[in-house]
């Protein structure tokens, strides 16, 4: 049987992965933009069918041979490793995100390019783990603990859970939240200092200065073909929000349009998370296939009305 070896690329992490080209398996890819070139190469070498997770939904878990993602360090990095599905990240992202504990080298590899995928011979069998020896010299009554011991063990377990929760929280803040905040701040600073922000602001001012313009902006952001690519990390919404806020401060945009502008630039929020969320909920294949386009269309249909409602409410706030 053909084996496919996948190694990490430049600056990548994890691996190498060795996949058996078992007939009937499928390649699911959840990536923004065009179909990655490594998907075509994997399909050519394995003979597996490639499934677009955004358009066609996720196949049954037993049918997934490998998952290809383009996550920069959020939840998507760990969703498939948590289910022990071989995962290829086209970005050079290591153990990161809320599910970082499930990202291990034997199931995850990142920074992969076409040249990192090769065909090898039969895989070397892994040595079987040695079974655990159990001590059966004691009776069951001798092995049971008393009430005081059980209370102590329960308290110790509770303290351990709370301590681990605090440690995971701090770890997530340091490794995920703070770096992302620094990235967005640096990006906004570069845009503002380079003069690109003024160019974008002048282009947005006609739209953001009138309710109908905000409705048009919401329709653009929530358009089903664009919203999955505008949503990741809410970076675009944050940048546009800063630029619009500056224009409001300068008096170029009326203050009472701040609330509808907030709804307009966030009309695409979470559209990129739909396949991941359905996977977390272990939804059926038919549910994913129908649910993804349904939510995208619903966001498109509800984006403009929410802007109008916000504009109506803002009339009572700013008087």
From Swiss-Prot:
Pfam families per record: EIIBC-GUT_C, EIIBC-GUT_N
Entry function: The phosphoenolpyruvate-dependent sugar phosphotransferase system (sugar PTS), a major carbohydrate active transport system, catalyzes the phosphorylation of incoming sugar substrates concomitantly with their translocation across the cell membrane. The enzyme II complex composed of SrlA, SrlB and SrlE is involved in glucitol/sorbitol transport. It can also use D-mannitol.
Disulfide bonds: none
Localisation per UniProt entry: Cell inner membrane
Listed GO biological process terms: phosphoenolpyruvate-dependent sugar phosphotransferase system; sorbitol transmembrane transport
First-listed, main subcellular location of the protein, grouped into a coarse class: membrane
The entry's keywords: Cell inner membrane, Cell membrane, Kinase, Membrane, Phosphoprotein, Phosphotransferase system, Sugar transport, Transferase, Transmembrane, Transmembrane helix, Transport
Cytoplasmic side: 1-176, 221-228, 278-296
NCBIfam families, per database record: EIIBC-GUT
GO MF entries: kinase activity; protein-N(PI)-phosphohistidine-sugar phosphotransferase activity; protein-phosphocysteine-sugar phosphotransferase activity
Catalytic activity, EC: 2.7.1.198
Record's bilayer topology term: Multi-pass membrane protein
Positions carrying Phosphocysteine: 71
Catalytic residues, chain numbering: 71
Domain PTS EIIB type-5 stretches: 1-178
Gene: srlE
Periplasmic topology ranges: 198-199, 250-256, 318-319
The protein's name: PTS system glucitol/sorbitol-specific EIIB component
Organism lineage string: Bacteria, Pseudomonadati, Pseudomonadota, Gammaproteobacteria, Enterobacterales
Domains: entry comment: The EIIB domain is phosphorylated by phospho-EIIA on a cysteinyl or histidyl residue, depending on the transported sugar. Then, it transfers the phosphoryl group to the sugar substrate concomitantly with the sugar uptake processed by the EIIC domain.
Residue spans crossing the bilayer: 177-197, 200-220, 229-249, 257-277, 297-317
PANTHER family xref list: PTHR39427, PTS SYSTEM GLUCITOL_SORBITOL-SPECIFIC EIIB COMPONENT
Induction record: Regulated by an unusual system which consists of the activator GutM and the repressor GutR in addition to the cAMP-CRP complex.
